[in-house]
Amino acid sequence: MPRKGPAPKRPLVNDPVYGSQLVTQLVNKVLLQGKKSLAERIVYGALEQARDNTGTDPVITLKRALDNVKPVLEVRSRRVGGATYQVPVEVRPDRSTTLALRWLVGYSRQRREKTMIERLANEILDASNGLGASVKRREDTHKMAEANRAFAHYRW
């Protein structure tokens, strides 16, 4: 256990194009091997494509997609006596946003479209409409928490 306490959260700068911290977080999640300009090109291209498909502000579409992907409950392992129980716990808001972005980017990487821009754009559009693999992941997480509701009294 560190004696200094938790490291302070570093401030997140707003995105220069859309002026949104969510877009900055999305760029950082897409980022691989330090290639930030490539990550920005992918995210901006995907948001432009989402704008072309919907005709609305892409940041609003992204927020709607994240609201459909953010988990409310998750399960955490808790060892009690010799058994390990999956205990359902509520997800903190910052963690739910991080998980939603991670799932959105992860499942867009697994899609079949040709370029990453198309994959990310289509996953964002699917998620904003309540479809897609990332929304299914949220439903599975909630189902798991519901199935293990009997162990909710082990919360910490």
Swiss-Prot record:
It comes from the Bacteria. GO terms for biological process: translation. Keywords: Ribonucleoprotein, Ribosomal protein, RNA-binding, rRNA-binding, tRNA-binding. GO terms for molecular function: rRNA binding; structural constituent of ribosome; tRNA binding. One of its GO terms (cellular component) is small ribosomal subunit. Transmembrane segments: none annotated. Part of the 30S ribosomal subunit. Contacts proteins S9 and S11. Belongs to the universal ribosomal protein uS7 family. NCBIfam families: rpsG_bact. One of the primary rRNA binding proteins, it binds directly to 16S rRNA where it nucleates assembly of the head domain of the 30S subunit. Is located at the subunit interface close to the decoding center, probably blocks exit of the E-site tRNA. PANTHER family: RIBOSOMAL PROTEIN S7. This is Small ribosomal subunit protein uS7. The gene is rpsG.
